[in-house]
Amino acid sequence: QYSPYVYYNEHCIVFNGVHTPMKIERATFVKLFDFVKLFPHYFLGSNADLPIVGGSILSHDHFQGGRYEFPMAKAPVEKSFTVKGFEDVQAGIVNWPMSVIRISGPDTERLIALADVILDAWRGYTDEAAFIYAETDGEKHNTITPIARKKDLVLRNNITTQEHPLGVYHPHANLHHIKKENIGLIEVMGLAVLPARLKNEMEELKQAILAGSDLHATPTLSSH
């Protein structure tokens, strides 16, 4: 179905016909490619399957797509690499604010197989120096946001600390007056989805500045 929010051209949501939770796995990649084979002029992606870095609804498997080219799709590969056993697949790190791997090739089965290898490797990856932990206290942190365009894999980590209880790799508290909601698939690809409250707050802020009012005296403006 087409989204009522229409964040971009022909913004659509594809639902799993069976009520099942969000889960990033090999079958996810198969579904993505099945869709873009039917609709080659569309992209299709899946939000991650963990809190904070995932979508707002994790209880039902779904995808988002559309007839639109996001900034991430235009971003170049800054470093190419080859995965052993997949020399026939082009792979590279995308020049993007998030950790993005782009893989491409003519054989979708090979792309699916490599995506599954990358997912499995990332699920268990830990780099303490970079504060990346596969899991802490039994809670898993690593997942990916896959996007197919006839493919980018965005590496995500949802670890939290006392200093950043909503996520280390999430907007920090000093930015929550702008946005504290999940950073999902659409934002990952370069389109900012800001909360509706900002529209009224920005107009209120404009009037307060023009009037020379004390911003700290107004609760809705003091954080700005």
State what each model feature region is.
Residues Q1-H224:
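HIT superfamily nucleotide-processing domains
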